[in-house]
Amino acid sequence: MVLVLGLAAPVAVASVASAAPVYCKLNPTFTVPQVIWVDGSGSSQTTRLCARVSPGRYVVQRGPYAGHVGRNGVAAPGAKREGDGKTPYGSYPMRGGFGIYANPGLASSWLRTSWRDVWVDDSRSALYNTHQRLPANGRWASAERMRLSPAYNYAQVIGYNERRTRGRGSAIFLHVDQGRGTAGCVSLPTSSLLAVLRWEKPGAWIWITQ
């Protein structure tokens, strides 16, 4: 018996190379493990989630996500003022989250808001730029309500002006996008915002540029 052996067709072997990392253009002095990089252009912005891989070097782990900053853009360094419709430039710690709905997965404190929760924006008040609860009882003349839908369905406090310097701006949050520039906050569509909140670990900072 004679066996006739066929020749197998050559199989192309493709080398699988890992995608080259995309580095974040951040302040080289950063040492925190995670940075939310928000790059503004007019009232629009692009957010990238950056993780440290070595001292001063960060790679993009998530994003880009499109959203908005202040309706009047990003303020020049140190130039942010109360009511100017601008988002403050610079780097700030991310603080606790809050919202109408339950914590979606943020690994930090979460406040389920009620109609009584407000953030004081009266620069003459001793409680300027802090979370308080109604009634005001003369303690402030104006405040941002924290139970607003859809903007504050999910939100997180950006640790801006924590020294509470009068007139330098208050109530700067990361919150749900409404399709237009904000009063000074950073906003993202709900799906993108939830991705950010679930990615974050305690100790993350935000870096806002233009």
Regions from the language model: what does each represent?
Residues 19-182, 193, 198-201:
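Cell wall/extracellular polymer interaction/catalysis modules
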Residues 185:
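Short cysteine clusters
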Residues 1-19:
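Secretory targeting and sorting signals
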Residues 188-210:
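Long, compositionally biased interface segments
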